[in-house]
From Swiss-Prot:
This is 7-cyano-7-deazaguanine synthase. Binds 1 zinc ion per subunit. It catalyses: 7-carboxy-7-deazaguanine + NH4(+) + ATP = 7-cyano-7-deazaguanine + ADP + phosphate + H2O + H(+). Pathway: Purine metabolism; 7-cyano-7-deazaguanine biosynthesis. It comes from Nostoc punctiforme (strain ATCC 29133 / PCC 73102). Belongs to the QueC family. GO terms for molecular function: ATP binding; ligase activity, forming carbon-nitrogen bonds; zinc ion binding. Its cofactor is Zn(2+). Its EC number is 6.3.4.20.
Length: 224
């Protein structure tokens, strides 16, 4: 079974890559260089894909800095730092990139239909503190309908399936799953700051570090 995997190089997407492999899929990973602040994740995506020895990995290039609207695509917007988990849960953060998962899933859908893949794996999870609107179950359900209505395969009764195995998992549970699957955490990248070493203070770093600490584990990634 062929599957397209949305691979950022982060903790979640690396876990779903290994999950797709465990599911017996022939994995075709796709990553995006959209001129994001944290482009270091692309090197992690390349390294993780190589380590996993998948069928194919490619990077799609486009520039979302032309639009801005996010701390990840506009350097004039400061990254939140040193926020507590409670503070992160108050509202949609400035690190939300407008419609990013819709853009990514559209590319993944086109790629999947072109290579006759049956599945698209995405690492969204609705229980993270950063409550992005395009990481929620109702969004995935709506996009599944787009997959059904917007493709030849879908209209012929064989829609490409969106697989979101992390959708109801907490970060600690994702790490536990990744450990079972053998995900190489030391190769992954979560930091938003755009430095050569993970900052340890942005929301993404803090969520990751807190989850490892809650499990009594040491995060193998090096932090500043």
């Amino acid at each position: 079974m062929k599957a397209v995997i949305l691979l950022s190089g982060g903790l979640d997407s690396s876990t779903i890559l290994y999950k797709a492999k465990a599911d017996g899929c022939e994995c075709h990973a796709i990553s995006f260089d959209y001129q994001q602040r944290h482009r270091q994740e692309l090197q992690s995506a390349l390294t993780v894909a190589k380590k996993a020895a998948i069928a194919k990995h490619q990077v799609v290039n486009f520039d979302l800095r032309q639009w801005g609207g996010s701390a990840l695509t506009d350097d004039a917007i400061d990254l939140p730092q040193q926020r507590s988990l409670d503070e992160m849960s108050q509202n949609i953060p400035v690190t939300y990139v407008p419609a990013r998962n819709t853009i990514f899933l559209s590319f993944a859908l086109g790629y999947a239909e072109a290579i006759a893949a049956e599945r698209v794996y995405i690492g969204v999870n609705a229980l993270d503190y950063s409550g992005y609107p395009d990481c929620r179950p109702d969004y995935i359900e709506a996009m599944q309908e787009v997959f059904r209505l917007g493709t030849k395969q879908g209209r012929e009764g064989q829609p490409i399936k969106i697989v979101a195995p992390l959708i109801n998992l907490k970060k600690t549970e994702i790490i536990q799953l990744g450990n079972e699957l053998g995900v190489p955490w030391e190769l992954t990248w979560s930091c938003y700051a755009g430095n050569d070493v993970a900052c340890g203070v942005c929301d993404s770093c803090r969520l990751r570090l807190a989850a490892f600490a809650e499990l009594g584990l040491v995060d193998p990634l090096v932090y500043a």
